[in-house]
């Protein structure tokens, strides 16, 4: 799913997100991860020895994941902003790891649903967009 200009700019300003996957026992696992967004709106998640991690195995098994990227803009007044992406996920290999020493193994998240709050100028509350079927 294509991201808006405001969403792209926001994501470029944030170094970390939290990836949620579901384990074999049905329990949700959430981990901080580095990411970058491709031109097509998919998210590439990398790391050290990624193929050895539970999140990688969870994605390989279920083909689903969610990523939240958010921050606290101000405490007074209270202002938060963020993006949650839910969708299809796959394990893959890249020829150009995200940073020196990173594994060539990656998780690619293709968004089916995007929630945003505080990112789009003038949009109050949370907004939701779903991939057209």
Regions of interest found by a model, annotated:
Residues 1-18:
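Short, basic/aromatic recognition patches
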Residues 41-42, 64, 88, 113:
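Structural motif
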Residues 18, 86-88, 110:
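Residues located in well-ordered beta-strands
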Residues 15-49:
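Short beta-strand segments
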Residues 93-133:
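C-terminal edge-of-domain segments
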Residues 44-46, 67-69, 116:
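Short hydrophobic/aromatic-rich beta-strand segments that constitute the beta-sheet cores
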Residues 49-105:
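Short, structured beta-strand-loop surface elements
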């Amino acid at each position: 799913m294509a991201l808006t200009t405001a969403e792209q700019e926001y994501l470029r300003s944030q170094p970390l997100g939290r990836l949620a996957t579901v384990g074999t026992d049905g329990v949700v696992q959430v981990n901080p991860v580095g990411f970058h967004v491709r031109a097509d709106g998919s998210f590439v998640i990398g790391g050290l020895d990624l193929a050895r991690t539970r999140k990688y195995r969870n994605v390989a098994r279920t083909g689903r994941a969610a990523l939240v990227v958010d921050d606290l803009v101000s405490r007074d007044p209270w202002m938060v902003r963020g993006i949650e992406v839910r969708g299809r996920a796959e394990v893959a290999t890249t020829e150009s790891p995200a940073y020196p020493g990173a594994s060539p193994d990656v998780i690619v998240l293709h968004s089916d649903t995007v929630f945003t709050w505080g990112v789009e100028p003038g949009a109050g509350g949370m907004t939701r967009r779903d991939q057209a079927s």
